[in-house]
């Protein structure tokens, strides 16, 4: 929203029922889905979409397990439009999006910086899907 994306174009997927309620109050024009990111493709299709332009994630990919990380990252890159981006915020200095998956989708990985305002500070990684 702060980057100029209209609130009514936001799709927010959250597993915590309490946080879903909060998001609906704070972003009343956004589509807020109570669900699991591992079911991302199902959630996106359920609202009539086939692709998305960008995904921003704060999911703790490193600690959610290798299989869940693979499922989520593949789903994101599969849903992205060509030229779209997957931004991942993490507390680890290395990109948690598996390079093998990035390469399958001919993505380009880059380090976007450190979110110093976050506590603790977080690393921001970006994968752009080949156009």
List where the protein language model places each region:
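A short SAM/SAH-binding and catalytic strip from SAM-dependent methyltransferases
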Residues: 49-68
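Conserved beta-strand signature within the Rossmann-like core of class I S-adenosyl-L-methionine
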Residues: 82-91
């Amino acid at each position: 929203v702060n980057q100029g994306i209209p609130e009514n174009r936001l799709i927010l997927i959250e597993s915590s029922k309490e946080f879903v309620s909060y998001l609906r109050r704070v972003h009343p024009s956004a589509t807020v889905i109570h669900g699991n990111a591992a079911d991302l493709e199902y959630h996106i299709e359920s609202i009539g979409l086939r692709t998305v332009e960008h995904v921003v994630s704060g999911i703790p990919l490193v600690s959610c397990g290798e299989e869940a990380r693979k499922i989520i990252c593949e789903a994101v890159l599969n849903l992205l439009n060509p030229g779209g981006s997957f931004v991942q915020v993490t507390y680890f200095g290395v990109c948690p999006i598996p390079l093998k998956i990035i390469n399958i989708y001919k993505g380009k990985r880059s380090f976007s910086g450190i979110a110093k305002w976050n506590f603790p500070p977080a690393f921001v990684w970006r994968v752009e899907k080949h156009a």
